[in-house]
Amino acid sequence: MIKNLFLFLTLFTVLPLQANTVESILENGMKIIVREDHRAPVVASQVWYRIGSTYEYDGITGVSHVLEHMMFKGTKKLKPGDFSEIIAANGGSDNAFTSHDFTGYHQRIASDRLEICLELEADRMRNVIFLQEEFNKELAVVQEERRWRVDNKPKSKLFEQFYATAFLSSPKRIPVIGWMGDLESLEMKDAADWYQQ
């Protein structure tokens, strides 16, 4: 009885949330999902790319995460760091993440500033530039992230080795942050080529 009540209440609370969601596909194939919520004059804008560690292969593991960092390092219009500075100057915040299957970029900003986010995302979707100095900095940051999150934590190292063994013939064996050996040999061209895909 309690199980059925829980299921009913769960459905009852989830169904109204779905009612305000609209999904459409643009001519270029990009899927747009909009969920309206007018409780506050704020918008959360997210762009997700179907790229992550499961698309990588030995020799370039970690390239999706490095590219995530490079997406903040300038375009034909913007200098390194300008993207986040523009969002912050308009009262917003931004960040990004890489997973096995997706890489996402998100901003939270006043709803009357949504156009700024969309213009910035459209720019970096097509116009990221790769500067060797910026690449070297970000590669070092990702390597340090790996040391901090995995190499210096026995439990994390254990789970990484477990996944590598359990998913031996699956791309899920590749850690999102990449193998340190691959990160040490990764070149800017690898990230630039990954971006062009």
Which residue ranges define each predicted feature?
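Hydrophobic side chains within alpha-helical segments
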Residues: 7, 68-71, 141, 148
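Intrinsically disordered, low-complexity segments enriched in polar/charged residues with Gly/Pro
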Residues: 9-12, 21, 34, 170-172
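Active-site-proximal flexible loops/turns
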Residues: 10, 72, 152
